[in-house]
């Protein structure tokens, strides 16, 4: 029975998370970038000087053992300010992940700043030296794997700034909780509590699939 309860716990934890991801797939000329959307995650740009663009560029992000290739980037075209910046509309609180590189490989002072409600949540310098080197099978030289950066955000508007100089962004991904308030545990099952398939406690009038005492019931 303990093994059965463990399987239930694992399933509910997996169901309790979802993700929205913005990637760039097509070339867009400078001054023509408007915005992007992925399942409620919205990226908007302010580009009054017509410098932002999207072009083809291969880069890997992840770790030395687990990484993903991206083939387009959003180029900011300069440092941020009133006429050049990015905002993200966050549909629900969670973890924001993003891939970014400096537009100048030799720059050592270009930072990315993530803020919300005038509070700085993330402020780090972006360096090419942050990448790890991996030798792919059959390759003659190593490939750079750049780090994925993460920050916790709440629902609402998030401001993305690059106050020192131009940066290139490859993706933005938001992982959110689905709002499960209580997870089914072995103790809960033994106490006769009822839950829906998302792991939320329900009352005796609940309809549909209900789990009680470790068993599934369909209630009409």
Regions found by a protein language model. Give the residues of each.
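Bacterial Sec-dependent N-terminal signal peptides
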Residues: 1-21
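C-terminal tail/sorting-segment detector
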Residues: 2-3, 209-220
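Terminal, low-complexity interaction segments
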Residues: 21-54, 60, 105-177
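Structural motif
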Residues: 38, 116, 197, 212-213
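Short beta-strands within extracellular/lumenal beta-sheet-rich domains
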Residues: 64-95, 107-108, 145-149, 166-171
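Short edge beta-strand/loop segments characteristic of extracellular beta-sandwich folds
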Residues: 97-101
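Residue-level detector of functionally pivotal "anchor" positions at catalytic/ligand-binding pockets or at interdomain
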Residues: 175-200
């Amino acid at each position: 029975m303990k093994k059965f309860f463990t399987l239930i716990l694992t399933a509910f934890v997996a169901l309790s998370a979802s993700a929205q991801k913005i990637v760039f797939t097509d070339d867009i000329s400078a001054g023509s970038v408007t915005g992007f959307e992925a399942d409620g995650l919205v990226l908007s740009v302010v580009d009054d000087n017509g410098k932002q663009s999207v072009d083809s560029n291969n880069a890997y992000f992840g770790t030395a053992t687990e990484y993903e290739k991206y083939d387009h980037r959003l180029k900011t075209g300069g440092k941020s300010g009133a006429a050049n910046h990015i905002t993200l509309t966050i549909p629900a609180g969670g973890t924001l992940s993003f891939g970014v590189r400096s537009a100048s490989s030799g720059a050592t002072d270009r930072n990315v700043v993530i803020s919300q409600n005038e509070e700085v949540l993330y402020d780090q310098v972006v360096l090419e030296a942050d990448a790890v080197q991996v030798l792919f099978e059959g390759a003659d030289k190593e490939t750079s794997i750049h780090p994925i950066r993460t920050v916790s955000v709440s629902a609402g508007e998030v401001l993305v700034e690059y106050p020192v100089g131009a940066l290139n962004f490859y993706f933005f991904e938001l992982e959110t909780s689905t709002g499960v308030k209580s997870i089914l545990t072995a103790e809960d099952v033994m106490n006769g509590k009822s839950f829906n398939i998302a792991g939320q406690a329900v009352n005796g009038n609940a309809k549909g699939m209900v789990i009680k005492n470790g068993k599934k019931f369909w209630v009409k």
